[in-house]
Swiss-Prot record:
Induction: Up-regulated when cells are exposed to severe hypoxia (in vitro). GO terms for molecular function: enzyme inhibitor activity; identical protein binding; lipase binding; lipase inhibitor activity. Disulfide bonds join C188-C216, C341-C354. Transmembrane segments: none annotated. The keyword Thylakoid does not apply. Homooligomer; disulfide-linked via Cys residues in the N-terminal part of the protein. The homooligomer undergoes proteolytic processing to release the ANGPTL4 C-terminal chain, which circulates as a monomer. The homooligomer unprocessed form is able to interact with the extracellular matrix. Changing R164A: Loss of proteolytic cleavage. Residues 1-25 form the signal peptide. It comes from Homo sapiens (Human). GO terms for cellular component: blood microparticle; collagen-containing extracellular matrix; extracellular region; extracellular space. The record marks R164, L165 as: Cleavage. This is Angiopoietin-related protein 4. InterPro entries: FIB_ANG-like, Fibrinogen-like_C, Fibrinogen_a/b/g_C_1, Fibrinogen_a/b/g_C_dom, Fibrinogen_CS. It is found in: Secreted; Secreted, Extracellular space, Extracellular matrix.
């Protein structure tokens, strides 16, 4: 009879569902458990839901088939009983239906129908269970997503420091940085004031400027922002105006911070400029000046108001109140009318008469013999002379307010 195998198949499908559920919830015997991803859990949940729906449809079809078979047998039983009561035509022995057999078949059909009802009920229970499991999975997914966002927010909330950038000109996304000041510090001195004592790379955000990366040098005098460093000739400093405006180089090696960034740090405030020089014999010199840097509308003019520390000859700086604009080979703003100092020498600088200093000149790993080459080098006239190419230089800046704060 076809009803029994169909019901058996449905029971086997139900058993397979139970096995899948027990396998999902049972303990893992492996010593190194592998946790399923959320996508795999979704696939499993949807698969189980489809299996439950298939079992339900199978049970409904089986019950419908059994009902139709029961009706046919009932009709056959009535016809057979009517034929048995008639004596007009003799019936063949094989065409006679024993009432006991009919009763037995009907009993079996009722029992089968009862089992189908039970199976249908179990399938409905399994489907409700799967729906609950699916809701639990969705809830866990939402909780997992919330925890993931909280983890990301926690990572964002950490002060991001000492991150590398391939070029000094690249800005930093402010959404990825939150400082202990509830904002990024304006400069390295502000970092020093909130307790930072370790030198390194930090992200700052001067007022009205996007965030950017700077080298901070922490000393007993406070925090200094490094704006230039030369020591090995790895970076070409003979660049056009836009490069000097934006900045270039490697923050871990040689670099120029950028005129616009330096101006955003100093703003309208007077600042201290420190210049560190080193020759090829290991001798070092430190010079400090009180300076004010103008904006691009002044060609980033540098005004040296007065010496703050170190020895500086009177002939090496312009008179008090005189500003020296910044020049490059493609934008000549120097004080020489008959010469483009940046083109004649090398690199961009605050050229006055082309002869007192140029810390962005060509780097020489050994001192050349030709005087024409020597004049293109890195020099500071009042310390080692006009034609002595220096081995290393560093320029640092700090707001003048630091003097009162320290």
């Amino acid at each position: 009879m076809s009803g029994a195998p169909t019901a058996g198949a449905a029971l086997m499908l139900c058993a397979a569902t139970a096995v899948l559920l027990s396998a999902q919830g049972g303990p893992v015997q492996s010593k190194s458990p592998r946790f399923a991803s959320w996508d795999e859990m979704n696939v499993l949940a949807h698969g189980l839901l489809q299996l439950g729906q298939g079992l339900r449809e199978h049970a409904e079809r089986t019950r419908s088939q059994l009902s139709a078979l029961e009706r046919r047998l009932s009709a056959c039983g009535s016809a057979c009983q009517g034929t048995e009561g008639s004596t007009d035509l003799p019936l063949a022995p094989e065409s006679r239906v024993d009432p006991e057999v009919l009763h037995s078949l009907q009993t079996q059909l009722k029992a089968q129908n009862s089992r189908i009802q039970q199976l249908f009920h179990k399938v409905a229970q399994q489907q409700r269970h799967l729906e609950k499991q699916h809701l639990r999975i969705q809830h866990l997914q939402s909780q997992f997503g919330l925890l993931d966002h909280k983890h990301l927010d926690h990572e964002v909330a950490k002060p991001a420091r000492r991150k590398r950038l391939p070029e000094m000109a690249q800005p930093v996304d402010p959404a990825h940085n939150v400082s202990r000041l509830h904002r990024l510090p304006r400069d390295c001195q502000e970092l020093f004031q909130v307790g930072e004592r370790q030198s390194g790379l930090f992200e700052i955000q001067p007022q009205g400027s996007p965030p950017f990366l700077v080298n901070c040098k922490m000393t007993s005098d406070g925090g200094w922002t490094v704006i230039q460093r030369r020591h090995d000739g790895s970076v070409d400093f003979n660049r056009p105006w836009e490069a000097y405006k934006a900045g270039f180089g490697d923050p871990h090696g040689e670099f120029w911070l950028g005129l616009e960034k330096v101006h955003s740090i100093t703003g309208d405030r007077n600042s201290r400029l420190a210049v560190q020089l080193r020759d090829w014999d290991g001798n070092a010199e430190l010079l400090q000046f009180s300076v004010h840097l103008g904006g691009e509308d002044t060609a980033y003019s540098l005004q040296l108001t007065a010496p703050v520390a170190g020895q500086l000859g009177a002939t090496t700086v312009p008179p008090s109140g005189l500003s020296v604009p910044f020049s490059t080979w493609d934008q000549d703003h120097d004080l020489r009318r008959d010469k483009n100092c940046a083109k004649s020498l090398s690199g961009g600088w605050w050229f006055g008469t082309c002869s007192h200093s140029n810390l962005n000149g060509q780097y020489f790993r050994s001192i050349p013999q030709q005087r024409q080459k020597l004049k293109k080098g890195i020099f500071w006239k009042t310390w080692r002379g006009r034609y002595y190419p220096l081995q290393a230089t560093t320029m640092l800046i700090q707001p003048m307010a630091a003097e009162a704060a320290s």
